[in-house]
Amino acid sequence: MVSSVVKKYAALCMVCLCSSLFFLGLYQFNNKYSQDTIQAANGILALSEEELQKSPVRFLVSGWAFYPDALLTPEEIRDESHYMRYLSIGEQTNFSSPASPSPYGCGTYQMTFFLPERKEVYALEIPEVFSAYNLYLDQDLILQMGEPAQGKPLVQNRMVTFHGGKPVTLTIAVSNYDHFYGGIVYPPAFGTMLAVNTTRGIRFAFCLFGCTVTFVCALLSFYFSRRMKQKNTFLFGLICLAMCGLSSYPVLHMLAAVPVFPWYTIELFCIYLVTWLIIVLQNRICRPGFLPAAISNGVGAAFLVYAFLYGMMASHLSLGAIRFFSASVFCYKAASALYLLIIAVLAIHRGEKRSRPIFYAAAAATCAFIWDRLLPVYEPVIGGWFLEWGSFFIAAAIGYSLWRDVIEGYGNSLIFQEERKQVVRQLSMQTEYSRQVSEAAAENRRLIHDIKHHLHTIDRM
């Protein structure tokens, strides 16, 4: 008994260690903010031939010149005196100062590139910018998403190219009145055209693969849930479908320019729909009791509605409402991770062996939440954030447990069908044998009757 407990908690420690190493590896090697590349300083990025060969693609995080509360053209920046400060992308999600962080308004970002004299084609990938912008190279307007002056939003992941050999000034004038994030939230990627295109292609292929796998899993789950009358399999199909919708957004933003509403509301809804469905399904598998299950399901459903309404009202939110939602998200995610871990532990103590994979996945998801708090400056180059990986681990563990039951049940069903065929075959053979015996008995009775008749006739003679 003691040996079993030691093995169980040794396995738990190993899961926590491996998941922590996994998240630390993501932070170090798959993080736009931890790339060991030269960054801009005071609005200027100077790169040599050797630096471009060493790092053909980099993410422009630091050293942006920023003009708050103004939509400016390059000529206006050069000819007039405007208030300016330097900032790093990701340190805030709004146009204003940290003392008054409102996401609504406008601002202008600028950076000057000093590139090698050799004329090579360079590429600049512009991720989703909230929510409309004009992009200038030197004095020329080369890209417009939405209408910044009129506040009409349009969002898409875009790429522009230009030739080096001379200083190039990049100016991005942004306005936002429709989303709870404002401005350039995610750092743009800059480098040689081949390197930037390769990074985009790998990211697109990864997202497309994730969408395909989750969609196929959803279809298979719906098929087996209908065939075998299993509600848990149907719920897992809904989880896969929600994860497919969530992972399809990078693909959507690469292929099409879309408005903020309703697409980002749907994305926010899918995030918390996955969490709520995981809670519901794990309650059904681990069976913590009626009251804990009812409370957790109700809280998850209420937060899902809250997140949906928050997304619907994204263009009319006060600063207090934004801060309250951020604090609520933190508390909800922490409580969800802790609750899923506790009910998995209790299920294992009750002797439910099929809950063991879910227990280890919940431990990995808890580690994901902890590292998400300890390492907040993280944005993946490829794939999802820490908490998305945690949700994936739990969904995969639940899927493994369910599919194991489905396969076992399907195998038993096939065995039962084969046994039924054997019984039907034996019954038909018995029926045929009984018919033959009955016919033989009837024939014997006829012969006996004829013999008796002949004997009676002989006696009379």
Residue map of PLM features:
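Interfacial "cap-and-anchor" motif at the non-cytosolic start of specific transmembrane alpha-helices
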Residues: 2-4, 244-420
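Extended carbohydrate-recognition surfaces in non-catalytic/accessory domains of CAZymes
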Residues: 4-118
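First transmembrane helix
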Residues: 22-31, 192, 196-227, 326-348
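Beta-strand-rich ligand-recognition modules
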Residues: 39-48, 137-169, 174-186
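Juxtamembrane interface at the cytosolic side of transmembrane helices
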Residues: 217-245
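Cytosolic signal-transmission helices at domain junctions
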Residues: 404-442
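Conserved phosphoacceptor histidine of two-component systems
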Residues: 442-456
